Amino acid sequence: MSASPIENLIKSLAVMPGLGPRSARRAALYLIKKRETALYNLAQALDEVQQSLVICPECGNIDSCNPCSICSDPKRDDALLCVVEEVADLWALDRSRLFAGRFHVLGGRLSALDGITPEDLSIDALVKRVQSGKIKEVVLAMNATLEGQTTAHYITDCLEKYPVRITQLAHGLPVGGELDYLDDGTLAQALRARRPVS
């Protein structure tokens, strides 16, 4: 006997990050209750996403145009390339409006535990972009995890033979953070990355 449409909706929602079975059930009930607005709008948005989204062949961003709006922006600095693990990281950095260069999405990070090797990531495409000679600085914007830092070191090794400056995002104290609430690793990194005030 096949599952009901409601059960299928709950199962589909439950696979999303941050939604367990209970949250998925609540979300499904909300959508059903508001089916004239919320459910219809969600279904329409999902259909549009399915029909129009493209993975940019240049950087790996997800957009509705090819190349993506970032890669096709002539105001961006071609000499700066920011390497991120996932599209969500690209979106977060771009939303800050503090980086005006290009991006490269790896599609994950190296992880022996999860069996993710360099071949599973777009590291070869990154090296080809650097080989083009246009890029003068590569900013490694990996997460401050063991896997993120392992990935950053691997990329550094891959790029060290090219005439490109390799930098990494600073890690340390969050704005508004209090010292007694920070973990030892964050405090140690903040101390190592300290800079003069004048």
From Swiss-Prot:
May play a role in DNA repair. It seems to be involved in an RecBC-independent recombinational process of DNA repair. It may act with RecF and RecO. The keyword Zinc-finger applies. The gene is recR. One of its GO terms (molecular function) is zinc ion binding. Belongs to the RecR family. Keywords: DNA damage, DNA recombination, DNA repair, Metal-binding, Zinc, Zinc-finger. PROSITE patterns: RECR, TOPRIM. One of its GO terms (biological process) is DNA repair. A zinc finger (C4-type) spans 56-71. It comes from Zymomonas mobilis subsp. mobilis (strain ATCC 31821 / ZM4 / CP4). Residues 79-174 form the Toprim domain. PANTHER family: RECOMBINATION PROTEIN RECR. This is Recombination protein RecR.
